[in-house]
């Protein structure tokens, strides 16, 4: 009997859908969820964010860092 293939469940994009939050550089609480404890942007394969939204998220995080709303690095 052959082994059954393992299928990973496809994660859904948290920014798609009706009740999805908008990506905004001023919403630091939302952006903090997509930054590691070292201050790095978490990749989309971990957060399940789509490519278009990941680019917008990265842009918002970088903008918030520039305006000193978020830190560049955490010690």
Curated annotation (Swiss-Prot):
Q: Which InterPro entries match?
A: Ribosomal_bS18, Ribosomal_bS18_CS, Ribosomal_bS18_sf
Q: Name one GO biological process term.
A: translation
Please provide one cellular component term from the Gene Ontology annotations of this protein. cytosolic small ribosomal subunit
Q: Does the keyword rRNA-binding apply?
A: yes
SUPFAM superfamilies in the record = Ribosomal protein S18
Keyword tRNA processing, does the record have it? no
- List all Basic residues biased stretches: 1-11
Q: Which Pfam families match?
A: Ribosomal_S18
User: What are the start and end residues of every segment in region (Disordered)?
Assistant: 1-21
- Keyword terms of this UniProt record: Ribonucleoprotein, Ribosomal protein, RNA-binding, rRNA-binding
Q: Name one GO molecular function term.
A: structural constituent of ribosome
- Role, per record: Binds as a heterodimer with protein bS6 to the central domain of the 16S rRNA, where it helps stabilize the platform of the 30S subunit.
The subunit structure is: Part of the 30S ribosomal subunit. Forms a tight heterodimer with protein bS6.
Q: Which family does it belong to?
A: Belongs to the bacterial ribosomal protein bS18 family.
- What HAMAP family does this protein's entry cite? Ribosomal_bS18
User: Under what name is this protein listed?
Assistant: Small ribosomal subunit protein bS18
Source organism of this protein record: Jannaschia sp. (strain CCS1)
Lineage start: Bacteria, Pseudomonadati, Pseudomonadota, Alphaproteobacteria, Rhodobacterales
